[in-house]
Every structure is written in structure tokens, then in C-alpha cells.
């Protein structure tokens, strides 16, 4: 047997067994005046809550414990969580939201207005003793101490939480999905998602370009056919013979021409008559002059 094992067995026998040594170990790191039974609480099966102090920081540990078969002692496991005082206060502040979320998940928890806690009584005492506290502060107590700031902050948050109307209160977070529900939702997302293959991107662009070129070619072909039809119709109109003039119009034209010719002939005969008459008058005058 090694020196270490002999020393450990001797210390265990001096302390009165493993339970006592376990209590001493659990009491290590705690402030004086606080026993292990006051700082350790059992939670269900193989779980404990330990209130301890580490580097002047108060911690609340929730850890799993297992039974060591070699020593018969309960030793802390790897699974657990540590909360500071601020986190613990925030957890208590949201206890109503947590209860509501649990009820939405199907829990049979009764719906109560408020759970009375020791901290609530302390806040009420602080509210009742505001005047005395102010006097003490005037007498020289430090208002900016961390403890005083923490108390004021918690008091203000509780007052605002109580005075806040129901409509403005934050709604509880939606319930977390169960594993099979999450799988169903993921399957729906994958089914509706668009599949993009890196190597197919260029091919898709080429297909779109070919489709566009094909549509443009069809449009140009349709335009050419329309122009050809238009030209053919124009040629047909040019090749058609002119309609023959109406006979009545031609007869009217001939009558007008004959009337013009007759008027011309009449004018010419009048001139000849005037000339002959003038010649006879001149001849008669000549004869008279000769006789004289």
C-alpha cells in the first residue's frame, strides 16, 4: 500500500467514515457559519443544488451526482449548470412565462397569479422602509455600493413588472419543437427549396440564351412574312386595269366641243358679213363721188 492510500484511509477513519468526509469536502469553500446541510439541497434523483462561493462570487450549482462504487460516496458528475445571483434573479423574474410555456406544451400545471417568494417579502420590506433607508444614506451609507445598486435594480424591475398592463407584457416564447416535429419541418423546407448545382449554372444560362435567340428568330420570321404579304397586295392593286369611263360623260364632252365649234363658226360668219357690208358702203360712196 502506498503512502497516499495509507494517509487517506487514516484520515477517513479519523473523520468517522466516508459520510463525514463527504460533508467536510462539500463544506469546503463555503463561508464560516454555513453548514453543508444548509447549502446542499436534493433535486429528485441523483441531482443536487449547491450554494457556494468562488472568488467572492456567489454561485448556485445544479449538478448530477453518481455513487462511486469503490468509496461508496456520491461524487459530482460532468453534467451541470452554475448560476450567479443575477441570473438566478432573472430566472425567478420569468417564472410566469416559463409556467405559461410549459402549459402550452401540455403540462397540467395550475394557473396561478403569483408565486410568493422570500425575495418578494424582502422587496416589500424595502418599500416600507424607504424613508429610513434614505435617512441612513444621508447619514453616510454608500448609495453606490454593489449591493445597494442590485437591490434598487431588482426593486425597480419588480415594480415595473407589476404595474405593466397585460397588453404590453412580453408574450412567452413559442414552444420548442419535438425531434419528430423538427424533422417534419426540415423535410418540408427541403422539399420546397430550390436545388442549385454549381456545375449546372453555365448550362442553364446557355439554355436561356438559346431560348431567347429562338424567340427572336421566330419574331423576325413573322415580320418578314407580314412584309411579303403586304408587298404582294400592293402589286395586285397596281396590276388591276383602270375602269372604262362612263359613256354619258364622253357624250357630254362631245356636246361641249361641238357647241364650242359652232360658236366659233358663227363668230366667223358675222365677221365676213360685216366686211362685205362695209365694202358695199364704200363702193356706194365711191359711185356718188364719181357722179359729182
Curated annotation (Swiss-Prot):
Q: Entry's Pfam families?
A: PC4 (PF02229)
- Where does it reside? Nucleus
Q: Where is the composition biased (Basic and acidic residues)?
A: 133-166, 179-191, 204-240, 251-267
Presence of the UniProt keyword Hydrolase in the record: no
The region called Disordered is annotated at 1-31, 117-292
Going by the entry's taxonomy, the superkingdom of the source organism is recorded as Eukaryota
Annotated keywords: DNA-binding, Nucleus, Phosphoprotein, Transcription, Transcription regulation
Question: GO terms for molecular function, please?
Answer: chromatin binding; G-quadruplex DNA binding; transcription coactivator activity
In the record, which positions carry Phosphoserine? 119, 268-269, 289
The UniProt entry's GO CC annotations, sorted and at most eight, read:
nucleolus; nucleoplasm; nucleus; transcription regulator complex
Q: Which InterPro entries match?
A: PC4_C, ssDNA-bd_transcriptional_reg, Sub1/Tcp4-like
Q: Name one GO biological process term.
A: RNA polymerase III preinitiation complex assembly
Per UniProt, the ranges with Low complexity bias are 20-31
Q: Any idea what job this protein has?
A: Plays a role in the release of TFIIB from the transcription complex during transcription initiation. Binds to TFIIB and specifically inhibits the formation of the TBP-TFIIB-promoter complexes.
Another remark in the UniProt entry says: Present with 7820 molecules/cell in log phase SD medium.
Q: Which family does it belong to?
A: Belongs to the transcriptional coactivator PC4 family.
Q: How is this protein named in the record?
A: RNA polymerase II transcriptional coactivator SUB1
User: In the record, what lineage is assigned to the organism producing the protein?
Assistant: Eukaryota, Fungi, Dikarya, Ascomycota, Saccharomycotina
Gene name for this UniProt entry = SUB1
